[in-house]
């Protein structure tokens, strides 16, 4: 039922079709998915492309599984997007996975369909798994995107999502990872040795949240916009 809730959410909000039986794996928060994915697909000595700046957990988990973090720089003049020309000049022979996160943390930069297409093309060319960490897609964002809106993306990509930011449910620890059945099965083999499932009451709450419509997102973003404007005013008064 929760898997179907996620599938309906993706269809309604991204126009993306996900098979609820084998292309969605609920998580106890998407953060654990970073560990599960790393354990499932990385071996000692493998390399991982990690954004700089970016979420610190990507690097710490990479080190935990004895893989090597290789940082790629995101710069304001490039709209905080990867420099694919620079990446192509990098030795990618040991790279197995690249972490991307848009809307980007900490800059807030948004993805575009063009960027997502470049990511998928890059992954396919070099046989690198693309993992899109997508928890902020509805926060101050008029055009939420999923990596799976790109044709053929399921061949080479996974996507993490979370109810923590979208529905203010951080303490509930509800997230998901989606992708093709083979990739999801590999992650499930790791996760099934970590826990025995999610409390049913939490699942029911998550299912109800996933059914909320645009009014919810609009009301939340109205609050966030007011808060952001206050921060801007404060920063200006402090000459920051």
Language model segments and positions:
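A short helix-loop-beta submotif of the ANL/AMP-binding
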Residues: 63-70
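Short acidic capping loops at alpha-helix termini that bridge into adjacent secondary structure
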Residues: 17-24, 44-47, 94, 154-157
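Active-site phosphate-binding strand-loop segment of PLP-dependent enzymes
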Residues: 70, 74-142
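PLP-dependent aminotransferase class I/II
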Residues: 156-236, 240
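Helix C-cap/helix->beta junction micro-motif
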Residues: 65, 125-126, 238
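N-terminal small-domain helix-loop-helix segment of the aminotransferase-like
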Residues: 1-29, 36, 210-212, 230
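Conserved PLP-anchoring active-site segment centered on the Schiff-base-forming lysine
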Residues: 40-62
């Amino acid at each position: 039922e929760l898997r179907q809730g996620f599938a309906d959410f993706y269809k309604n909000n991204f126009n993306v079709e996900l098979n609820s039986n084998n292309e969605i794996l609920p998580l106890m928060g998407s953060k654990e998915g970073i560990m599960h994915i790393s354990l499932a697909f990385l071996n000692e000595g493998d390399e991982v492309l990690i954004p700089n700046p970016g979420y610190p957990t990507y690097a710490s988990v990479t080190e935990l599984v004895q893989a090597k973090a290789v940082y790629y720089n995101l710069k304001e003049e490039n709209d905080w997007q990867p420099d694919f020309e620079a990446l192509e000049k990098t030795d990618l022979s040991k790279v197995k996975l690249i972490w991307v996160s848009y809307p980007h943390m900490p800059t807030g930069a948004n993805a575009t369909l063009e960027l997502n297409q470049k990511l998928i093309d890059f992954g396919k060319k070099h046989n690198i798994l693309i993992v899109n960490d997508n928890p902020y897609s509805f926060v101050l964002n008029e055009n939420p995107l999923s990596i799976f809106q790109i044709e053929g993306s399921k061949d080479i990509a996974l996507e993490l999502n979370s109810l923590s930011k979208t529905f203010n449910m951080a303490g509930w620890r509800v997230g998901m990872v989606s992708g093709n059945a083979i990739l999801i099965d590999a992650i499930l083999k790791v996760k099934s040795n970590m826990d025995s499932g999610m409390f049913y009451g939490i699942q029911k709450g998550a299912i109800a949240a996933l059914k909320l419509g645009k009014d919810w997102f609009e009301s939340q973003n109205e609050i966030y916009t007011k808060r952001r404007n206050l921060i801007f005013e404060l920063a200006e008064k402090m000459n920051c």
